[in-house]
Amino acid sequence: MKIDVEVIKELRQITGAGIGDCKEALESCSGDMDKAREYLREKGLSKAYKKSHRDVADGLVAVFAEGDVGAILKLGSETDFVARNEKFRSLALGLVRGLYGYGVEDLEGFSASSYDGSRVADEIVAAAAVLGENVVLSGVGFVKLSGPGVIGSYVHGMVSEGLGKAAALVVLEGGPHSDELASFAKQLAMHIVAAKPEALSIDTLSSDVVDRERELVARQVEALGKPDSVAQKIIEGRMQKFFEEMVLLEQVFVMDGQTKIRDLLVQKGQSLKHEIRIAAYRLFAIA
């Protein structure tokens, strides 16, 4: 059957597929738009799976926070060219809002969940077919206030609202929402993106990571031939510097270069007349 060119254009606009593929789909489905979309989806999936072995070195981080909930995810692509494609950006924003509604930090579960009449995983593979590159959802994060407080966010290298090359969410609890607290939360999110902490506190830093570092430092100090009492002080000093690099609460605030984050929380709490604490944070970045 002859397919009207405007119908072909409409299907192309909806799916992002090529003109020839859209024409073929409509002809195979007797002009039925919904069936043609499904036809393209199935055809696209087979193409995309062939790309799934390729490395993803680029992409975008998407973040969405509203009220007492925040969501963040990392969507990978092979090149920056595709990462800046409108379809890729739209997918990332749609997925992060879907994660916001899904309400659980579970990559596997979210990937299997419903999205736009399909599954998240299938939508990603279909997008890969249209974009011509491997597309991978490599990480999801979800945070929620458990009491009075605020969720702050920051996007670095922003290409559009809520999308960039790195982003962070931070949950501040202990005081009622205020402009001052919200501004402070954003500053902390900016610090997190810049300083890239591996853990919130020393207690939450992986014991394996700490043990490996302590063993390395001990070997280095042993080579100095110092008395045990002196060597132990050197080890503890170097471990403290290690924690100041790795642990958020021990880091020096990048905006003033002198105040530790844990001390900054005390200062802000005194200003707001409420004890303020960081309940959680999430950070994703494109390497």
From Swiss-Prot:
Subcellular location: Cytoplasm
Region of interest (Involved in Mg(2+) ion dislocation from EF-Tu), ranges: 79-82
Superkingdom, natural source: Bacteria
Keyword Cytoplasm: yes
Gene3D superfamilies: 1.10.286.20, DNA helicase RuvA subunit, C-terminal domain, Elongation factor Ts, dimerisation domain
One Pfam family, short name: EF_TS
GO cellular component, one term: cytoplasm
UniProt xrefs under InterPro entries: EF-Ts_dimer_sf, Transl_elong_EFTs/EF1B, Transl_elong_EFTs/EF1B_dimer, Transl_elong_Ts_CS, UBA-like_sf
UniProt KW keywords: Cytoplasm, Elongation factor, Protein biosynthesis
Principal location listed in the UniProt entry: cytoplasm
Gene Ontology molecular function terms on file: translation elongation factor activity
Function, as annotated: Associates with the EF-Tu.GDP complex and induces the exchange of GDP to GTP. It remains bound to the aminoacyl-tRNA.EF-Tu.GTP complex up to the GTP hydrolysis stage on the ribosome.
UniProt family annotation: Belongs to the EF-Ts family.
NCBIfam families (UniProt xref): tsf (TIGR00116)
Protein name: Elongation factor Ts
Native source species: Anaplasma phagocytophilum (strain HZ)
High-level lineage: Bacteria, Pseudomonadati, Pseudomonadota, Alphaproteobacteria, Rickettsiales
